[in-house]
């Protein structure tokens, strides 16, 4: 297996350590469980439905998004470099009777034999955890079919994002383990759109996600100041 070298061992170890609680809706990944319906709806609606489509989930982790896409009829392949998260993902899929092809590999290496193969590629909450985000973006672009969709989500790099996602979510609210995020690795929307454009991915839409700690609810917002998603289309 060729992996290429766009991997941060410390990031892999961080999520390996938490893998056992991946599917606990009240555990360390509670925010992902609560956020996932918004992600799934955005992907499905923007792409015109993913039923019957070939979908690649880059940085799938324990499979929360992968499983939800498979349940609505997508043919899903999940990529990750963490052994423990992949083991958890495979076991949970087996227990729930969902068919997903989980593979240990990087996007760059998987691209070598899968150019233009997927109708939809998702890369959610992953770019801020790799040394070279532009390399992942280019690989995603290379693997999607012309006219296909590539979805990215990450965190904006500004003071508000630092306060909400690190000081708030990690230190005050204890929603995430301390050290989950590094503010220096956050990506501004303008930067992400430029990187996508360089990979011949046209940004069709962008939406923000906001969290209310009182109601414990995530919702869409027009503001891209903190968490956000973009939908891009591969040029024909």
UniProtKB/Swiss-Prot annotation:
<keyword id="KW-0489">Methyltransferase</keyword>
<comment type="pathway">
    <text>Cofactor biosynthesis; ubiquinone biosynthesis.</text>
</comment>
<dbReference type="InterPro" id="IPR010233">
    <property type="entry name" value="UbiG_MeTrfase"/>
</dbReference>
<protein>
    <recommendedName>
        <fullName>Ubiquinone biosynthesis O-methyltransferase</fullName>
        <ecNumber>2.1.1.222</ecNumber>
        <ecNumber>2.1.1.64</ecNumber>
    </recommendedName>
</protein>
<keyword id="KW-0949">S-adenosyl-L-methionine</keyword>
<dbReference type="InterPro" id="IPR029063">
    <property type="entry name" value="SAM-dependent_MTases_sf"/>
</dbReference>
<comment type="function">
    <text>O-methyltransferase that catalyzes the 2 O-methylation steps in the ubiquinone biosynthetic pathway.</text>
</comment>
<keyword id="KW-0808">Transferase</keyword>
<feature type="binding site">
    <location>
        <position position="39"/>
    </location>
    <ligand>
        <name>S-adenosyl-L-methionine</name>
    </ligand>
</feature>
<feature type="binding site">
    <location>
        <position position="59"/>
    </location>
    <ligand>
        <name>S-adenosyl-L-methionine</name>
    </ligand>
</feature>
<dbReference type="GO" id="GO:0102208">
    <property type="term" value="F:2-polyprenyl-6-hydroxyphenol methylase activity"/>
</dbReference>
<dbReference type="GO" id="GO:0032259">
    <property type="term" value="P:methylation"/>
</dbReference>
<feature type="binding site">
    <location>
        <position position="124"/>
    </location>
    <ligand>
        <name>S-adenosyl-L-methionine</name>
    </ligand>
</feature>
<keyword id="KW-0831">Ubiquinone biosynthesis</keyword>
<dbReference type="Pfam" id="PF13489">
    <property type="entry name" value="Methyltransf_23"/>
</dbReference>
<dbReference type="GO" id="GO:0010420">
    <property type="term" value="F:polyprenyldihydroxybenzoate methyltransferase activity"/>
</dbReference>
<comment type="similarity">
    <text>Belongs to the methyltransferase superfamily. UbiG/COQ3 family.</text>
</comment>
<dbReference type="GO" id="GO:0061542">
    <property type="term" value="F:3-demethylubiquinol 3-O-methyltransferase activity"/>
</dbReference>
<feature type="binding site">
    <location>
        <position position="80"/>
    </location>
    <ligand>
        <name>S-adenosyl-L-methionine</name>
    </ligand>
</feature>
């Amino acid at each position: 297996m060729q992996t290429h070298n766009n991997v941060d061992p410390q990031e892999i170890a961080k999520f390996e350590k938490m893998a056992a609680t991946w599917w606990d809706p009240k555990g360390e990944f509670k925010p992902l469980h609560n956020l996932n319906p918004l992600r799934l709806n955005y992907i499905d609606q923007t792409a015109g439905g993913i039923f019957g489509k070939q979908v690649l989930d880059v940085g799938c982790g324990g499979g929360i998004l992968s499983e939800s896409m498979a349940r609505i009829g997508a043919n899903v392949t999940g990529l990750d470099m963490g052994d423990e998260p992949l083991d958890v993902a495979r076991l949970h899929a087996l227990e729930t009777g969902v068919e997903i092809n989980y593979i240990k590999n990087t996007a760059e290496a998987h691209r070598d034999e899968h150019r233009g193969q997927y109708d939809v590629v998702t890369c959610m909450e992953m770019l801020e955890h790799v040394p070279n985000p532009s390399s992942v973006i280019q690989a995603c672009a290379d693997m999607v079919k012309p006219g296909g969709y590539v979805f990215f989500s990450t965190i904006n790099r500004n003071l508000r994002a630092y306060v909400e996602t690190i000081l708030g979510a990690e230190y005050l609210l204890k929603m995430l383990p301390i050290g989950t995020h590094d503010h220096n690795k956050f990506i501004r929307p303008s930067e992400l759109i430029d990187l996508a454009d360089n990979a011949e991915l046209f940004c069709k839409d962008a939406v923000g996600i906001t969290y209310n700690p009182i109601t414990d609810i995530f919702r869409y917002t027009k503001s891209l100041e903190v968490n956000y998603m973009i939908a891009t289309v591969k040029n024909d």
